[in-house]
Each structure stands twice: as C-alpha cells, then as structure tokens.
C-alpha cells in the first residue's frame, strides 16, 4: 500500500469529527453564543436602566432639596412677616396707650385748672365777703354815727365808680 492510499478509518474519523464540529456549532456553540449575547445585552440594558433610575433619583433628590429650600425660605418669610406684624401691633398699642395717657393727663390738667379756678373764685368770694364784714365792723367802730358811716360809704363808692 502506498503513500497515497486512503485510509477509510481516518477518513471516517475525519468525517465524524467534521460532523461533530458542525452539530456542536449548530446545537451547542451558536445557542451558547446567542444566549451569552442576549445576557450581555440584558446586562447593558439593566445598567442603562439603573443609570436612568439613578439620574431620575438624583433629579428627584435635587428637586426635593429645592422644594425643601423654598419651603424653608417661605417659612422664614412668614415668620419674619409675623414678627414685623407683631412689632407693628405692639408699636400701635404703645402709641395708642401713649395717646390715651396724654389725653388722661390733659384731661386731668384741665380738670385741675377748672377746680383751681373754682377754688380761686370761692376764695375770692369768701375774701370779698370777709372784707365786707371786716370793713363793716371796722366802720362801725370808727363811725359810731350812722350818718357819718353812710357819707363815708357814698364817698368810697363814688371813687370806685370814677375809677371804673
């Protein structure tokens, strides 16, 4: 048998090897590669989805922080407004009380002045009465005579009328 003789056993083995590679490729390797590719794509999609969720979560967190900041700012503004309003109310009450106190003081001063004038008039009236009584008694002692007393009173009245 020569060098170029065909060994049918080796040819059959080669043929079986090629068939085995073909079937392994078709039924094992190709489905495995497809499954691995699908898994890779699924992992990539999951990673993209996770990244999107992370971005959305970050947006929501920043939006929540912004809302919280705005709420704090509004609360601070409300507190400041309430404080200013309270100060204004206190100041208004203070001014009102001050005006009322001034009115009371003015009223008291006016009342005191009226009472003082009344008292002064009463004192003057009483002094005039006492003066008349005193003058009458003095004149009675000085002028025992009724006629002399009348002449003296007429003289004084004439002088007073001339002065007026």
From Swiss-Prot:
Any one annotated GO CC term: proton-transporting ATP synthase complex
InterPro entries registered for this protein in UniProt: ATP_synth_B-like_membr_sf (IPR028987), ATP_synth_b/b'su_bac/chlpt (IPR002146), ATP_synth_F0_bsu_bac (IPR005864), ATP_synthase_B_chain (IPR050059)
Record has Cell inner membrane as a keyword: yes
Membrane topology: Single-pass membrane protein
Subcellular location: Cell inner membrane
Broad class of where this protein is predominantly found: membrane
Cystine connections: none
MF terms (GO), sorted A to Z: proton-transporting ATP synthase activity, rotational mechanism; proton-transporting ATPase activity, rotational mechanism
UniProt key word Ion transport: yes
Source taxon at top rank: Bacteria
Residues annotated as transmembrane: 10-32
Keywords for the protein's UniProt record, in alphabetical order: ATP synthesis, Cell inner membrane, Cell membrane, CF(0), Hydrogen ion transport, Ion transport, Membrane, Transmembrane, Transmembrane helix, Transport
Functional summary from the UniProt entry: F(1)F(0) ATP synthase produces ATP from ADP in the presence of a proton or sodium gradient. F-type ATPases consist of two structural domains, F(1) containing the extramembraneous catalytic core and F(0) containing the membrane proton channel, linked together by a central stalk and a peripheral stalk. During catalysis, ATP synthesis in the catalytic domain of F(1) is coupled via a rotary mechanism of the central stalk subunits to proton translocation. Component of the F(0) channel, it forms part of the peripheral stalk, linking F(1) to F(0).
Quaternary data: F-type ATPases have 2 components, F(1) - the catalytic core - and F(0) - the membrane proton channel. F(1) has five subunits: alpha(3), beta(3), gamma(1), delta(1), epsilon(1). F(0) has three main subunits: a(1), b(2) and c(10-14). The alpha and beta chains form an alternating ring which encloses part of the gamma chain. F(1) is attached to F(0) by a central stalk formed by the gamma and epsilon chains, while a peripheral stalk is formed by the delta and b chains.
Recorded family membership: Belongs to the ATPase B chain family.
Name the UniProt record assigns to this protein: ATP synthase subunit b
Lineage: Bacteria, Thermotogati, Thermotogota, Thermotogae, Thermotogales
């Amino acid at each position: 048998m020569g060098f170029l003789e065909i060994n049918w056993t080796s040819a059959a083995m080669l043929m079986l090897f090629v068939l085995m590679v073909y079937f392994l490729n078709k039924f094992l390797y190709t489905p495995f590669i497809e499954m691995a590719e699908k898994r890779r794509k699924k992992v990539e999609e999951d990673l993209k989805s996770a990244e999107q969720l992370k971005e959305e979560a970050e947006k929501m967190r920043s939006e929540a922080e912004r809302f919280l900041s705005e709420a704090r700012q509004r609360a601070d503004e409300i507190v400041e407004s309430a404080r200013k309003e309270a100060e204004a109310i206190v100041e208004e009450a203070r001014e009102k009380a001050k005006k009322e106190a001034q009115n009371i003081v003015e009223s008291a001063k006016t009342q005191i002045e009226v009472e003082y004038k009344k008292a002064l008039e009463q004192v003057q009236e009483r002094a005039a009465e006492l003066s008349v009584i005193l003058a009458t008694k003095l004149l009675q002692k000085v002028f025992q005579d009724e006629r002399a007393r009348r002449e003296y009173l007429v003289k004084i009245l004439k002088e007073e009328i001339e002065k007026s």
